[in-house]
Curated annotation (Swiss-Prot):
Its EC number is 3.4.24.-. The lineage of its organism: Archaea, Methanobacteriati, Methanobacteriota, Methanomada group, Methanopyri. This is Protease HtpX homolog. Binds 1 zinc ion per subunit. The gene is htpX. The chain crosses the membrane at residues 1-21, 35-55, 56-76, 178-198, 209-229. One of its GO terms (molecular function) is zinc ion binding. The active site is at E168. Coiled coil: none annotated. Zn(2+) binds at H167, H171, E235. Pfam families: Peptidase_M48. Its main location: membrane. One of its GO terms (biological process) is proteolysis. It is a multi-pass membrane protein.
Length: 318
């Protein structure tokens, strides 16, 4: 099994290197497959080296993936404090016209993308992060949910919102919820495979347990960084496909610049690990500073804008 794990790691590293040769759809897909392969390779090594917790790690990973994928919409809504559009309008009716237009945009983009009608939810400013302009998509491809913040309704114009919604529906079309759920579940399985308390059930050697603590910390760090790298690749892909879907790359670029300027001037405080864990779902990470930079789930806005400007020139033609 060690040889097989080594082969998976080498093959995945090769795919990752090839994927880094470009920043367009096919190369981004190769990059994602390569990073997922590295995660699976690390897990395979853990399962090969550790007999006791291997089964536990695998079972926990599978259960976590299934539960997170099946109930992702409900889980994310609770984490973000999102409410139905109708409920939001009951106590903030001044947004009725804007939300009606947003719902029409969502319906139009979903139809163009060949997706079923998504559920629209709103994150009120009272949640803290809801005061910043932002958006997210979650749920299965057959039953998607698109969320916008109150800050997005207040700060962005219709063209910019349309560009943002195109990005979010591209995530749904690309099954990014499934990709990120699998990546996070494998990362969880790695952590459990190296868990010192589980392994203590199978050994009384404290030197082995100490090694597992260090190995587990390193494996968890590497897997977390790899999950963040997958998220960054998927953001590039959603930018490209979302801009093509909306037909206006510059509107998305301007929206990203506006969101970045507002977040930079007054970053959202990360009040809990639960909030930080949702960072990869937003179109732009609202949290800033500290160690969060090391685990960035989004590419730099300036790079995203540069790519969108290039795409706009290509779509305009000679």
């Amino acid at each position: 099994m060690l040889e097989a794990a080594g082969a998976v790691l080498l093959g995945s590293a090769a795919l990752l290197m090839v994927g880094r040769l470009g920043n367009r759809g096919f190369f981004l897909w190769l990059r994602t497959v390569g990073i997922l392969g590295l995660l699976v390779g690390i897990l395979s090594l853990a399962l090969a080296a550790l007999t006791g917790s291997a089964i536990a790690g695998l079972v926990v990973g599978v259960i976590t993936a299934a539960m997170m994928y099946l109930f992702s919409s409900r889980i994310v809504r609770i984490q973000m404090g999102a409410v139905d559009a109708e409920e939001f309008l009951r106590y903030k009716p001044e947004y009725a016209d804007k939300l009606r237009r947003v719902q029409e945009m969502v319906s139009k983009l979903a139809s163009k993308a060949g997706l079923p009608e998504p559920e629209l939810v709103v994150v009120p400013e009272e949640t803290g992060v809801g005061g910043y302009p932002n958006a997210f998509a979650t749920g299965r491809r057959s039953k998607p949910t698109v969320g916008v913040t109150e800050g997005l309704l207040r700060h962005l114009d219709d063209d910019e919102i349309y560009g943002v919604l195109g990005h979010e529906l591209a995530h749904v079309k690309n099954r990014d919820t499934l990709v990120m759920t699998v990546a996070a579940a494998v990362s969880t399985a790695i952590a459990y495979a190296f868990d010192p308390w589980l392994n203590a059930m199978y050994t009384e050697d404290w030197e082995d347990i100490a090694f597992l603590v260090l190995a587990g910390m390193l494996a968890s760090l590497i897997s977390t960084l790899l999950v963040a790298a997958i998220s960054r690749s998927r953001e590039y892909l959603a930018d490209e496909e979302g801009a093509k879907l909306s037909g206006n790359p510059m509107a998305l670029a301007e929206a990203l610049e506006k969101i970045e300027a507002i977040v930079k001037s007054n970053p959202a405080p990360a009040r809990s690990l639960s909030e930080v864990s949702t960072a990869h779902l937003w179109i732009e990470n609202p949290f800033r500073g500290g160690l969060l930079r090391l685990f960035s789930t989004h590419p730099p806005v300036e790079k995203r804008v540069e790519r969108l400007r290039r795409l706009a020139r290509e779509l305009q033609g000679p």
